[in-house]
């Protein structure tokens, strides 16, 4: 119950100040707007080179700005300095009793850190050389009834930082910059693909079948149809239907939902882009992916050399290309190019202490387990790892020279996957058989196996051209380009465990 809320002494003081304002018919919450004519960033840029004397002699227009009080210090009984922040910058205010009047100055001295104020005034520079606004009018626009954390200590509890992101954003300019960079990265990617003639589309979030990726879905219920449906684990199968329908380049940036673990790299709800281009293959996508990473980096960083987890990466260099089997051979000496039986592969797994679940008892699965166990963490420079086994790639085209493997790649940087791409399987007969194999895996306990999507098979039976498709994790890309350790640092409101 709201009546049971307990307030600290400082919160009670603030509430009492607000009550006094209401009693004086000065309720700030009734103010509907404050028309600014500039921003703090623009002021700082415009006047950064003006001296104190130049500003005194300058014929100035009145500046009208707004911001949140972050610092307050009195200069005697008749003046005070205040620092305010807006979205992109901060500035100092100089407020004098003889310039704003007795009543307004008394109201001003009752303000608290965190209050949002509107200001009118002229630009000046203090004796210490700090660019400031000499205030002619100060108006309380919104009263902060809760105090901010200590300016220097900030939010100490990392969980609270994510739960109360609004406070984190108030206190930390760098956090705001990270999310502004995220928006720039997404917009840059959209512009890049739009300029190549590819079309951004929207496909359903609620799916009647699970498919397009190997993942556990969230299940919900459609009341009007009285049936369970899944939140999408990928956008792939709908986008490929559009290629069948005649579009030659489509992409979607959107939320994906996977009912799996949470970690510094995983959030159950995340953002990805999937792109499909007709008449191209995975090698085309390798080149395109390099371009995407470079153009997105240029949008938010001044150098092609970025630092992530204390490792420097040069995105201007060509990305390496490594066959999965070659990578395993280089690290472990095991040669999976040799034809072998499942029994022989299981013996190798046992020898190298690689755990194999029941549904993974195939040569292809064991190859992938070796890669994940021994190779993945050794990759530092951007590397396209390609040639995934057919068993773990139910939607990728088989390699024509060695059908045990597929024309598929994943991009790894510093041991993390950033992209997954195929030369798409467009053979409806092969696709039907692979869906059947997925059902067999499900019967052996693989709860990430795809359903049989007969409608998708029928779509392929109308003929899909040779097609290249890729998925890129937006959140991980933003982490890389902004040097953030945790996925929670690039999600405005990450999923958190319920409070006790």
Curated annotation (Swiss-Prot):
Catalytic function, reaction form: tRNA(Lys) + L-lysine + ATP = L-lysyl-tRNA(Lys) + AMP + diphosphate
Cofactor note: Binds 3 Mg(2+) ions per subunit.
Keyword Metal-binding: yes
UniProt: Mg(2+) 1 binding residues: 410, 417
Chain sites annotated for binding Mg(2+) 2: 417
NCBIfam families referenced in this protein's UniProt entry, alphabetically: lysS_bact, PRK00484.1
Protein name listed in UniProt: Lysine--tRNA ligase
Major location (coarse): cytoplasm
BP term (GO), one: lysyl-tRNA aminoacylation
InterPro entries: Aa-tRNA-synt_II, aa-tRNA-synth_II, aa-tRNA-synth_II/BPL/LPL, Lys-tRNA-ligase_II, Lys-tRNA-ligase_II_N, Lys-tRNA-synth_II_C, NA-bd_OB-fold, NA-bd_OB_tRNA
Species annotation: Mycoplasma capricolum subsp. capricolum (strain California kid / ATCC 27343 / NCTC 10154)
GO molecular function annotations of the record: ATP binding; lysine-tRNA ligase activity; magnesium ion binding; tRNA binding
Gene3D superfamilies for the chain: Bira Bifunctional Protein, Domain 2 (3.30.930.10), Nucleic acid-binding proteins (2.40.50.140)
GO cellular component, one term: cytosol
């Amino acid at each position: 119950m709201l009546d049971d809320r307990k307030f600290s002494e400082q919160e009670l003081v603030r509430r009492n100040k607000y009550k006094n304002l209401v009693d004086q018919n000065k309720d700030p919450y009734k103010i509907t707007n404050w028309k600014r004519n500039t921003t703090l960033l623009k002021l700082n840029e415009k006047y950064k080179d003006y001296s104190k004397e130049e500003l005194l002699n300058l014929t100035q227009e009145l500046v009208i700005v707004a911001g949140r009080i972050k610092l307050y210090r009195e200069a005697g009984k008749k003046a005070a300095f205040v620092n305010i922040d807006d979205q992109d910058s901060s500035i100092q205010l100089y407020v004098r009793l003889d310039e704003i009047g007795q009543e307004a100055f008394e109201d001003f001295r009752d303000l608290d850190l965190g209050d949002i104020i509107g200001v009118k005034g002229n630009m000046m520079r203090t004796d210490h050389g700090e660019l400031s606004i000499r205030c002619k009018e100060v108006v309380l626009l919104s009263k902060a009834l809760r105090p901010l954390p200590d300016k220097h200590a900030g939010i100490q509890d990392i969980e609270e930082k994510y739960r109360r992101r609004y406070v984190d954003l108030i206190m930390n300019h760098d956090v705001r910059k990270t999310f502004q960079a995220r928006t720039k990265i997404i917009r840059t990617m959209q512009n890049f693909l739009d300029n190549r003639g590819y079309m951004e589309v929207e496909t359903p979030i609620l799916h009647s079948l699970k498919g397009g990726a190997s993942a556990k879905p969230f299940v919900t219920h459609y009341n009007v149809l009285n049936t369970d449906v899944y939140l999408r684990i990928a956008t792939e199968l709908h986008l490929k239907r559009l290629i069948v329908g005649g579009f030659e380049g489509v992409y979607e940036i959107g939320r994906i939902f996977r009912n799996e673990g949470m970690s510094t790299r995983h959030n159950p709800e995340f953002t990805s882009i999937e792109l499909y281009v007709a008449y191209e293959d995975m090698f085309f996508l390798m080149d395109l992916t390099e371009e995407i990473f470079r153009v997105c980096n240029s949008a938010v960083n001044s150098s092609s050399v970025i630092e992530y987890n204390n490792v420097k990466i040069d995105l201007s260099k060509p990305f390496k290309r490594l066959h999965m089997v070659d990578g395993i051979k280089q690290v472990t000496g095991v040669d999976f190019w040799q034809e072998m039986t499942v029994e022989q592969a299981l013996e190798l797994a046992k020898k190298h202490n690689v755990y194999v679940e029941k549904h993974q008892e195939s040569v292809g699965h064991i190859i992938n387990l070796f890669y994940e166990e021994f190779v993945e963490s050794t990759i530092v420079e951007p590397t396209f790892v390609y040639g995934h086994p057919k068993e773990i790639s139910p939607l990728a085209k088989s390699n024509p020279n060695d059908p045990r493997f597929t024309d598929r790649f994943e991009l790894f940087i510093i041991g993390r996957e950033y992209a997954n791409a195929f030369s798409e399987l467009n053979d409806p007969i092969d696709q039907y058989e692979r869906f059947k194999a997925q059902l067999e895996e499900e019967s052996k306990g693989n709860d990430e196996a795809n359903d049989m999507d007969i409608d998708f098979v029928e779509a392929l039976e109308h003929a899909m051209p040779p097609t290249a498709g890729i998925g890129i994790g937006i959140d991980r890309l933003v982490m890389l380009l902004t040097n953030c350790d945790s996925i929670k640092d690039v999600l405005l409101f990450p999923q958190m465990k319920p409070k006790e």
